[in-house]
Amino acid sequence: MRKPVIAGNWKMNMTCTEAIEYMRVLIPLLKDIPKKDREVVIAPPFTALYPLSEFIRDKNDCLSLSSQNVHWEDSGAYTAEVSPLMLNELSVKCAIVGHSEPRKYFSESDEQINKRAKSAQDHQLIPIVCVGETFQQREMGEAERVIRRQIEQGLEGIEVKKLIVAYEPIWAIGTGKTCEANEANRICGLIRKWIGYEDVIIQYGGSVKSNNIDEIMSMSDIDGVLVGGASLDPTNFARIANYEKI
């Protein structure tokens, strides 16, 4: 049985004060979600992880925190990076790796993403490994080849039972364009086949909103969502977390 994971990636948004106020609104709106039914994860900026880890402690069983990245070394001369040991101290549960923005802006390779994912697992963090194609790659009929390469190289040596994969078609991130639910479901099914483990959690990400979440979560091979901009409003994100299958 695959338990859905609804994750909100705040990216470079929210001060610590804003993050706490956000949680004051969000937590009461999640009170009717049983832990056994689904999990809700928030990935704030690194600066907000400590105050949020203290604030949400013992407040909601289904709510946990994720980092937006993690380095493969425990410490060292890696300016602007965060180590898995630092995240362990904050009771962080997950770590996003391979998001399209670091891939694009910082030229992150599948090899680096693989090292980050392994480091996360070695330190009892669940990596949320992001994969997805550009619009040009999709138009040229290369989407499946690109995603399969990202899966094979990014997940080499990874324990698939302790993993979340997020399919994020890059052309749908922050653009308002959403991959059709049936097509997203088809790709997620292929990812499951390529990984070779039926119970791996596979999320969809890309312009997920409160008005399309019910349809997305009704798909058989989609086990959750990784939400960007729509997660910045607590009421809106609560509606997404409280989805109802069609």
Swiss-Prot record:
Active-site annotation: 99, 168
A cellular component term, taken from the record's GO annotations: cytosol
Residues where substrate binds: 9-11, 174, 207, 228-229
SUPFAM superfamilies: Triosephosphate isomerase (TIM)
Gene3D superfamilies: Aldolase class I
Protein EC: 5.3.1.1
Pathway terms, separated by semicolons: Carbohydrate biosynthesis; gluconeogenesis; Carbohydrate degradation; glycolysis; D-glyceraldehyde 3-phosphate from glycerone phosphate: step 1/1
Gene Ontology BP term (one): glycerol catabolic process
GO molecular function: triose-phosphate isomerase activity
PROSITE patterns in alphabetical order: TIM_1, TIM_2
Catalysis: reaction(s): D-glyceraldehyde 3-phosphate = dihydroxyacetone phosphate
PANTHER family referenced in this protein's UniProt entry, alphabetically: TRIOSEPHOSPHATE ISOMERASE (PTHR21139:SF42)
Recorded family membership: Belongs to the triosephosphate isomerase family.
Complex formation: Homodimer.
UniProt-recorded name of the protein: Triosephosphate isomerase
